[in-house]
Regions:
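Hydrophobic residues in well-ordered beta-strands that form the structural core
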Residues: 55, 87-89, 176, 213, ...
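Histidine-centered catalytic micro-motifs
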Residues: 86-94, 157-159, 212-215
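Acidic-and-aromatic substrate-binding clefts and catalytic sites of carbohydrate-active enzymes
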Residues: 33-38, 58-72, 95-100, 151-161, ...
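Active-site beta->alpha N-cap acidic-glycine motif
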Residues: 20-113, 117-121, 132-150
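C-terminal domain-boundary segment and adjacent tail
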Residues: 53, 63, 221-260
Length: 260
């Protein structure tokens, strides 16, 4: 079984650009880090379905181990790189933008939701914010041996034009998600059951959409993954969709290529 698993991973990794050349109705599945308990199961589904995704990573608290970018999870990240997935920053301390601050130079009120400063409201300049993006990217490169994409996702998708301009100036383009691409794994399961979320996604997703889910959500009682993930992938394939990473996304392709 181990040999077969490695062979499948190699086949996915080697598919490369030829796989995407035939992808004329693409969607772009992305995962943000979380408590990581379901991460191994998500990886199994992605490998079984030969789907490559883009992972946005922060060093978040985990149910097992020393944080989602800690040493405990290092083998998991290396395996995903070997399978041909892409990686990008989610800010090191999972930092939420709260407000722009007045002044000539860009400054922001932010709140870390992981690490030593968790919960604190902080006033940061552009350099401090960019360092947060870069720190997660540097750690990803150490873990995976692969250069991350010059992209990032702000936690919660919370941004301002000034914040986006500051990140762009230090080399990072922001990636959000399509309205239909919000897969709902953060929503309470007593009101938004897995079958309901699956049906909504299969009904609403359109070609070109960026989709977002997480590697574990602390607050959801009925985990979204892997229960919804495989039926979603199968259902989208049956509707003629194919899957690509953000390296191939038309809005980011030139930006990624220019970064080398």
């Amino acid at each position: 079984m181990r040999h077969a698993s490695k062979s499948a991973a190699l086949a996915i990794a080697l598919a490369g650009p030829m796989a995407w050349a035939a992808c004329d109705k693409p969607v772009y599945l992305t995962f943000d880090t979380g408590h990581m308990e379901v991460a191994p199961l998500i990886a199994e589904v992605l490998q079984r379905q030969a789907v490559r995704v883009t992972f946005f990573a922060a060093n978040e608290r985990t149910k097992v181990g020393d944080g989602s970018l800690g040493e405990h999870w290092a083998p998991w990240w290396r395996e995903r790189a070997a399978e041909g997935h892409e990686f990008a920053s989610h800010t090191w301390s999972h930092v939420y933008w709260r407000a722009d601050l007045p002044g000539a130079a860009p400054r922001f009120k932010v709140q870390a939701s992981a690490g030593a400063q968790q919960g604190l409201l902080l006033n940061w300049g552009a350099a401090e914010y960019c360092q947060q993006i870069q720190q997660a990217g540097d750690r990803l490169q150490t873990l995976t041996g692969k250069k991350p994409l010059p992209l990032y996702r702000a936690p919660g998708g919370k941004t301002s034009p000034q914040l986006l301009a500051a990140a762009k100036a230090c080399g990072y383009a922001h990636v959000g998600w399509a309205a239909a691409g919000f897969l709902g794994d953060e929503l309470p399961s007593d009101k938004f059951s897995n079958p309901l979320l699956l049906a909504k996604a299969l009904r609403d997703i359109r070609s070109g959409d960026i989709l977002v889910a997480h590697l574990g959500i602390w607050s959801r009682q009925e985990p979204w993954a892997p229960a919804v993930l495989e039926p979603l992938l199968l259902g989208l394939k049956a509707r003629g969709f194919c899957f690509a990473t953000l390296r191939e996304h038309p809005a980011y392709r030139a930006w990624v290529a220019a970064s080398g």
